[in-house]
């Protein structure tokens, strides 16, 4: 049977059944799998050098966890660390060469007074002893995880040449309670699932969160008025704007790269079609006009094209149309079900929910080499809603395990997975946010 889009499942009552659950708390996190071919790196403990109270955050532990879950690095286990230098001048490189480490990170945490801490760290190439990075950052105790994520980003970029995406955020929806008394929440958290923040609470379903390019707002679908409506909400202030509540379906908002427009799916003229809305004038441009269901639009990085899901050919596939209108062309040809596309920053990779029979997994279409290569990234049977990290090194997606919804973040080579689970609610509808500005 052809799988319905998420918003259509809501409308016809096809939501997965939920057991009785209480209101959500934070996510529990664990790493699944490992990459033996990853680059070995030793991230040494960074002790606190002062008599005042130490920060609660284990900075080096967060850095190591970030690098591990990227799939590009394999950090040396603490039990195998035989020496613990905190300055580059203290490193004995033959020790780390014998441990077959390519890189080493050392550092220390200092009291910077007035409730702040200073983290100093260095990155070295073990093979030649060259210092590749030496930086210091100062922050309050509450921001030490942010500091650690930024450190991991800097290390990742220095070694790989690609900007890190650890200092980013994710959005997702939780669902708790039982039928007749369901509660939904739109949440925002750090990229590793820590520091969850509730953005919206509702007794009606919430769907399809999408980040503005500056990371300050979220567009989403709410059913609080009975039918579907699209809102845009400011994360910091909580203020929100109703932008689409036309008769029929209002679904799948997607911010343009310029932040001034959204693409969306509307059934105001009959079948669900793809539109573009100017967020100032609210003027609509209709891009598609087919006999099938056109939904789940997502923009190319330059804003010139929109990818979307359509069953105009009989089964759901990904199509592409110019953002100013024109003839749509089919993009996916492998498999009889491809939906819910997410496009990489360079437009060379697309991840989709790919179905075969009753099994739905996350697959990536990679055109980086000039030819089309498909890889399956997930291992479940009901995996959906993939979302690229801003550097395309990881993919966030939703899955079903034991009758409940969980999230996974998988490395682009599929070798490392991070599972994000709420102890008291379903987790679904993930969206990876853009790069955050560093102040």
From Swiss-Prot:
Signal peptide: 1-22
Localization: Periplasm
Keyword Oxidoreductase included in the entry's annotation: no
Alphabetical UniProt keywords: Cell cycle, Cell division, Periplasm, Signal
Gene Ontology biological-process entries: cell division; protein import
Gene Ontology terms: cellular component: periplasmic space
Quaternary state and interactors: The Tol-Pal system is composed of five core proteins: the inner membrane proteins TolA, TolQ and TolR, the periplasmic protein TolB and the outer membrane protein Pal. They form a network linking the inner and outer membranes and the peptidoglycan layer.
Family classification: Belongs to the TolB family.
Role this protein plays: Part of the Tol-Pal system, which plays a role in outer membrane invagination during cell division and is important for maintaining outer membrane integrity.
Protein name per UniProt: Tol-Pal system protein TolB
Organism field: Xylella fastidiosa (strain M12)
């Amino acid at each position: 049977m052809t799988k319905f889009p998420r918003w259509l499942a809501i409308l016809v009552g096809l939501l997965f059944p939920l057991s009785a659950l209480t209101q959500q708390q934070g996510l529990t996190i664990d790493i699944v799998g490992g990459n033996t071919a990853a680059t070995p790196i030793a991230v040494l403990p960074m002790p606190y050098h002062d008599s005042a109270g130490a920060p609660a955050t284990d900075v080096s532990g967060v850095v190591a966890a970030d690098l591990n879950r990227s799939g590009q690095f394999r950090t040396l286990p603490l039990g195998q660390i035989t020496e613990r230098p905190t300055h580059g001048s203290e490193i004995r490189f033959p020790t780390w060469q014998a441990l077959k480490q390519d890189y080493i990170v050392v550092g220390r945490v200092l009291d910077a007074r007035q409730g702040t801490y200073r983290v100093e760290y260095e990155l070295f190439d073990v093979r030649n002893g060259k210092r590749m990075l030496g930086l210091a950052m100062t922050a309050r105790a509450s921001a030490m995880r942010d500091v650690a994520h930024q450190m991991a980003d800097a290390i990742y970029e220095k070694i790989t040449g690609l900007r890190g995406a650890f200092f980013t955020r994710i959005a997702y929806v939780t669902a708790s309670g039982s039928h007749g008394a369901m509660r939904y929440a739109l949440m925002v958290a750090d990229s590793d699932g820590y520091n969850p923040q509730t953005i919206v609470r509702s007794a009606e379903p919430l769907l399809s969160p999408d980040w503005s390019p500056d990371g300050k707002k979220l567009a989403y679908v709410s059913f609080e008025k009975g039918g579907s409506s699209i809102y845009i909400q400011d994360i910091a202030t909580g203020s929100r704007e109703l932008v689409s509540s036309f008769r029929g379906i209002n679904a799948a908002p997607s911010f343009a790269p310029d932040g001034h427009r959204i693409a969306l799916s509307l059934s105001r003229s009959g079948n669900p079609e793809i539109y573009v809305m100017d967020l100032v004038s609210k003027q609509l441009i209709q891009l598609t006009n087919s006999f099938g269901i056109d939904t789940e639009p997502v923009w190319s990085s330059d804003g010139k094209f929109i990818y979307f899901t359509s069953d105009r050919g009989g089964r759901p596939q990904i199509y592409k149309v110019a953002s100013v209108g024109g003839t749509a062309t089919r993009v996916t040809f492998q498999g009889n079900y491809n939906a819910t596309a997410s496009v990489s920053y360079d437009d060379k990779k697309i991840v989709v929910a790919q179905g075969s029979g009753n099994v739905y997994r996350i697959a990536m279409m990679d055109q980086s080499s000039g030819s089309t290569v498909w890889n399956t990234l997930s291992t479940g049977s009901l995996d959906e809603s993939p979302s690229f990290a801003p550097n395309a090194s990881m993919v966030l997606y939703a899955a079903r395990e034991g009758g409940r919804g969980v999230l996974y973040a998988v490395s682009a080579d599929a070798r490392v997975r991070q599972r994000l689970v709420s102890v008291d609610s379903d987790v679904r509808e993930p969206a990876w946010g853009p790069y955050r500005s560093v102040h």
